Swiss-Prot record:
Pfam family, one: Psb28
Protein name in the entry: Photosystem II reaction center Psb28 protein
InterPro entries with a match to the protein in the record: Psb28_c1_sf, PSII_Psb28_class-1
Paired cysteines (S-S): none
Organism: Prochlorococcus marinus (strain MIT 9215)
Gene3D superfamilies: Photosystem II Psb28
Membrane topology: Peripheral membrane protein
UniProt entry keywords in alphabetical sequence: Membrane, Photosynthesis, Photosystem II, Thylakoid
């Protein structure tokens, strides 16, 4: 079930999440700390074909794995619709590592990057 992508996201080990999230970044003024908010609409991880408990989100690329355990499910009319994950970085090297993953993930999924002015 795992596709051969350079960068991927998994909620269950060995199973890539095919739904591409909206990703929003915020950083402190000095740029050393911040967070990335991932918002997945109707992800496969919440579908009836998946079994098990989501305990985190793995961001996997050629350098290895970044893990966040901050994952929440948002319900609409009693149905799980959104999966929200937050990755927090606490120093510039963590941010640089995250950005390398983000660039690789964007290339793997044909995405672009835009900055709010």
């Amino acid at each position: 079930m795992t596709a051969n992508k350079t960068a991927k996201i998994q909620f269950y080990e060995g199973t890539d999440e095919p739904v591409v999230p909206e990703i929003r970044l915020t950083r402190s003024k000095d740029g050393t700390t911040g967070q990335a908010l991932f918002l997945f609409e109707k992800p496969q991880a919440l579908s009836s074909i998946t079994d098990g408990e989501i305990t985190g989100m793995r961001m996997i690329d050629s350098e290895g794995e970044i893990l966040t355990k901050e994952v929440k499910v948002k319900f609409v009319d009693g149905e799980p619709i959104y999966l929200e994950a937050v990755y927090i970085w606490k120093n510039s090297s963590d941010f640089d590592r995250f950005m390398r993953f983000a660039n690789s993930y964007a290339k793997s999924n044909g995405l672009g990057y835009s900055e709010k002015k």
